[in-house]
Amino acid sequence: MTTYHFIGIKGTGMSALAQILHDSGEKVQGSDFEKRFFTQEALEQKNITILPFSKENIKEDYTIIAGNAFSDDHIEIQKAKELGCKFYRYHEFLGEWLKQYTSIAVTGAHGKTSTTGLLSHVLKSAYPISYLIGDGTGNGHVDSEYFVFEACEYRRHFLKYEPDYAIMTNIDFDHPDYFTSLDDVVDAFQSMADRVKKCIVACGDDEQLQGIHTKVPVIYYGFNDSNDFQAQNVVETANGTEFDVFVRNTYYDHFIIPTYGNHTVLNALAVIAICHYEGISVEHMKQLDTFEGVKRRFTEKEIGSQIVIDDYAHHPKEISVTIESARKKYPNKNVVAIFQPHTFTRTKTFLKEFADSLNEADNVYLCDIFKSAREDSGQLTINDLQKLIPNSQLLSLKETEVLQEFKDSVLIFMGAGDIQKFQAAYEETTTKSTNFQD
């Protein structure tokens, strides 16, 4: 039996792919930095071996899958090439693996992970499926017909895939360390659209997606009257959001989702549209109302009188919709944003936009810019962002207890770096504090 060795197995996509291969009966192991990462709990639950990096991990008969964060001079990659091992980058292997299924790619600048999770949740109520979610969740099944996966546009990696279907949630300028402009991003999505084999489900409210040319049918969804699938009569309740769906101007059915914000309605519409196209019953679609969410996307807990939320938001638009969701769910509470910018390039590119979106919160705390593996220095500091946000404060890891003063408030920890360690430090301090009252 082939042994699949994952270099960087704790990465969100890598962890998910390793779990899928394991569940499909393959022999899987991997290596990574020894620092604990939130993805490794699922790997440990499945008894997938995680080793520290060492060239001794690599054997001649192994198939090697390397995370995209690691360069060719990594000790394990060098060893694999010396031994002549079968070698793939993550996106290359995924592109080959999904060919054995009816594949559904979920792509877009924002909303990929939540929509992938939502679609997987609905489909698995109807069929045995495999799915790969960008929060590190992966599930395989030996009898899978469908393979649902998150497809990232960064460095045009999604052009290694030829999916049967694609959901396109939106197009926006991001990853400024790679893309040069919005037009460059649009070009990447156009190339992706050219690779889809059966049908594209796209948000018709997105101006850029309206301009995509395709050789396959396109189903549009959204709030506008021109869409094939339209949400109307949207009502927010204590338990979530309810709305009616019209298919080509004809009433279809009423749906409930346990989330808030127009972006979550759009995610649900995308799922409804592709399920309708595939002939899946409305009863299965209504599993939308039992969706419990994905990791690091509006993940909530209560601490005393506070609601503490962990969210991956790292783009100005994502920050805005996360704050919007908090206000809709908790209309009588103050919203406190605790934000850690991710990469110097993104922070510099969107400095004013970050300030504008964070100003939508009642109070703002800023953590130092996260230095990613792709860059470790920049010409600006967190102070440049602070200057644009009146009354904002800097937050250090040793002083998180200042957040205790916000009684009966919503605290949102946002970022794609290690913002979770700030939340963990706050929770630990609060647990020990005798002064923190409900």
UniProtKB/Swiss-Prot annotation:
Top-level division of the source organism's lineage: Bacteria
Residues that hold ATP according to the record: G108, A109, H110, G111, K112, T113, S114
NCBIfam families: murC
PANTHER family, per database record: UDP-N-ACETYLMURAMATE--L-ALANINE LIGASE, UDP-N-ACETYLMURAMATE--L-ALANINE LIGASE-RELATED
Cellular-component GO terms for this entry: cytoplasm
InterPro entries given in the database record: Mur-like_cat_sf, Mur_ligase_C, Mur_ligase_C_dom_sf, Mur_ligase_cen, Mur_ligase_N, MurCDEF_pg_biosynth, UDP-N-AcMur_Ala_ligase_MurC
GO molecular function, one term: ATP binding
Function noted in UniProt: Cell wall formation.
Descriptive protein name: UDP-N-acetylmuramate--L-alanine ligase
Pathway recorded for this protein: Cell wall biogenesis; peptidoglycan biosynthesis
Pfam families per UniProt: Mur_ligase (PF01225), Mur_ligase_C (PF02875), Mur_ligase_M (PF08245)
Protein localization: Cytoplasm
Family: Belongs to the MurCDEF family.
The enzyme's E.C. designation: 6.3.2.8
Record keywords, A-Z: ATP-binding, Cell cycle, Cell division, Cell shape, Cell wall biogenesis/degradation, Cytoplasm, Ligase, Nucleotide-binding, Peptidoglycan synthesis
